[in-house]
A protein has these predicted regions:
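NAD(P)-binding Rossmann-fold cofactor-contacting core
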Residues: 17-31
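Generic structural signal for well-ordered alpha-helices
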Residues: 7, 67, 130, 158-161, ...
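Conserved alpha-helical substructure of the radical SAM core
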Residues: 84-195, 206, 210-218, 222, ...
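Short, small/polar residue-rich loop motifs at catalytic or cofactor-binding pockets
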Residues: 322-325
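Conserved C-terminal portion of the radical SAM core fold
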Residues: 136-146, 165-172, 191-200, 218-312, ...
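Flexible mid-to-C-terminal extensions adjoining Fe-S/redox cofactors in radical SAM and related proteins
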Residues: 49, 88-90, 319, 330, ...
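Phosphate-bearing ligand-interacting subdomains
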Residues: 27-86
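Glycine-rich adenosine-cofactor-binding loop
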Residues: 1-11, 20
C-alpha cells in the first residue's frame, strides 16, 4: 500500500517508475497499476540494465528489514537508496467505523462485554481529521481507512475516498466482504480506492465459518465476482488483495480453490499465519492467564503464540524500538488516539483523547509514557506482530497436523506443506 502512495507522489513530480519490488510471493511477476512486481532477488539483474536506477524504500514499518536485505544482496553500494519515510508524515490509519458485522475468534470484536465504544465518524468530522493530517503532514502519501472496523459499511465511504484523492493521497481499505451491498459497492468502486484487502479464511463454509464467525463465504465469493465486474465496467485499477488467514483447517484444498478463484478474477492472494489479537490477549497469555477463547483458538493455529514469538525473536529490533509506536498514528472513530494499532482497551493506552486538539509532537511525547510498551518490547511482541523471520514460522507450520478435509500430503503424512 505504501508503494502505491509513493507512486502517486512520483507521478505528481514527473519521475519515472520502472517496477515494484516486493518479497511477498503473492505479488511475484504480477502487475500493479501497470508496473510489474519483482522479487528482491531480481534486483541485481534489473539494476545492471541501466545506470539511472534508484531504489525508493516506501515501507517505513519495514525499512530496516529492507535495508538489511539490500546489504545481503550486496547492492546497497551500487545504486542510490532513498527512504520515503518522513518523520512528519507517519502512517495514518483512520477507523472511520469502529464496529464490525462479524465476530472472528482472532479479533477483539469477538470479546464479550467490551467497553470499547462503537460508532462511526461523520463525513464532516472525517474532513476535519483529514484536513488536519494534511496540515500536520503535507508530504503524506497514503492513508488507511480502517483499523478494527468494517469500513465498507460506512454510508459515505465513496465521498470520503474522493475527499482524500482530491489531495492526491492514496486510500487503502480492508473488508470481510460478507456484506449485502445492494448498489453501494459500485459507488465505492467508482471512487477508485487504490488498495482493497479482502480478509478471509477458507473457500468452503465449514472452514470459513469456524474462524470468520457470522460471515457467509458464499456471499463473499459472490461479491468477489461482483467486484471484478464493477472494476471492469468502470475501468478501475484498484489492487485487490485476498488476504488469506492460514489455520490448520483451511490450508490445503481450501487455499488451492481460493487461489484458483483469484487467478480467474485477476486478484492477488497473500497468505498470512493467523495471529491472536489484540495485544492485551497475547500479553495475558504470556502472563499465564489466557482467556478461554484464546485457548480454543490456539488449537487451530498453525503457529502458536509461543512459536510465533520464538520465530520472530530470531530477528530482534534494536532495543527500545517499535515500528508501530514510531511510524504510525491511529485515529479511532471517536477521535481518540491509541498508542498503536495492536491495542484494544482504551484506559491507559490512549495517548490523545481528541486528535483534532493534539499535535504530532504531543502525541509522540505521550507515547513515550505508556507503560505497556516496555512490557510489549520485552516480550518481543512488535516482532511477533510484524511476522519477522517467516521461514521460522514456516518451519513450525510444517510440523503440524492439518484437518482440511480431503487433503492429504503425497506421503500420506497429513502434515502442513511449506509451500
Amino acid at each position: 500500500m505504501t508503494g502505491l502512495g509513493a507512486l502517486r507522489k512520483l507521478r505528481e513530480n514527473n519521475l519515472n517508475v520502472h517496477c515494484f519490488i516486493d518479497s511477498d510471493a503473492a505479488f511475484n511477476e504480477k502487475k500493479s497499476y501497470g508496473y510489474k512486481v519483482f522479487n528482491p532477488n531480481k534486483l541485481k539483474k534489473i539494476i545492471n540494465t541501466s545506470n539511472d536506477f534508484a531504489i525508493l524504500v516506501a515501507v517505513a514499518l519495514k525499512e530496516d528489514e529492507i535495508k538489511n536485505q539490500l546489504r545481503e544482496l550486496k547492492i546497497d553500494n551500487s545504486v542510490l537508496v532513498h527512504s520515503f519515510h518522513d518523520e512528519n508524515a507517519p502512517y495514518y490509519t483512520v477507523d472511520i467505523l469502529s464496529s464490525c458485522n462479524l465476530k472472528c475468534a482472532s479479533c477483539p470484536h469477538s470479546i464479550e462485554d467490551s467497553d470499547v465504544p462503537k460508532g462511526s465518524m461523520t463525513l464532516g468530522t472525517f474532513k476535519e481529521v483529514f484536513d488536519k493530517i494534511i496540515k500536520d503532514s503535507p508530504s503524506v502519501s497514503h492513508i488507511s481507512l480502517y483499523s478494527w472496523g468494517e469500513p465498507l459499511l460506512h454510508p459515505y465511504l465513496d465521498e470520503i475516498i474522493n475527499y482524500v484523492h482530491d489531495k492526491n493521497v492514496a486510500v487503502a481499505l480492508s473488508s470481510n466482504l460478507s456484506i449485502n451491498f445492494d448498489k453501494r459497492l459500485e459507488k465505492i468502486i467508482k471512487a477508485k480506492p487504490d488498495y482493497l484487502k479482502i480478509s478471509l479464511s477458507g473457500f468452503y463454509p465449514d472452514a470459513y465459518n469456524n474462524t470468520h464467525q457470522g460471515g457467509d463465504i458464499r456471499l463473499v465469493k459472490s461479491n468477489l465476482y461482483l467486484l471484478r465486474y464493477l472494476l471492469d465496467k468502470n475501468n478501475v485499477n484498484t489492487l485487490v488483495d485476498i488476504n488469506y488467514h492460514l489455520y490448520k483447517d483451511n490450508s490445503f484444498e481450501n487455499i488451492r480453490k481460493m487461489e484458483d478463484l483469484a487467478d480467474e478474477l485477476g486478484f492477488i492472494v497473500s497468505k498470512t499465519y493467523a495471529l491472536v489479537m489484540p495485544l492485551e490477549r497475547v500479553i495475558a497469555h504470556q502472563d499465564g492467564k489466557p482467556d478461554f477463547q484464546t485457548q480454543q483458538l490456539e488449537k487451530n493455529l498453525l503457529v502458536t503464540i509461543d512459536e510465533g514469538i520464538q520465530a520472530s525473536s530470531e530477528m530482534k529490533l534494536p532495543v527500545n524500538t517499535c515500528p508501530f509506536r514510531e511510524n504510525q498514528i491511529n485515529i479511532n472513530a471517536d477521535l481518540s488516539v491509541p498508542i498503536c494499532c495492536t491495542v484494544w482497551q482504551r484506559d491507559t493506552n490512549v495517548v490523545a483523547s481528541n486528535f483534532l486538539n493534539s499535535s504530532i509532537v504531543e502525541i509522540n511525547e505521550a507515547k513515550k509514557n505508556v507503560k505497556l510498551c516496555e512490557k510489549c518490547m520485552d516480550l518481543n511482541l512488535p516482532e511477533y506482530n510484524m511476522g519477522f523471520n517467516k521461514s521460522g514460522w514456516d518451519e513450525y507450520a510444517s510440523q503440524k497436523q492439518h484437518s482440511d478435509k480431503g487433503c492429504i500430503a503425497n506421503d500420506g503424512s497429513n502434515k502442513i506443506s511449506r509451500k
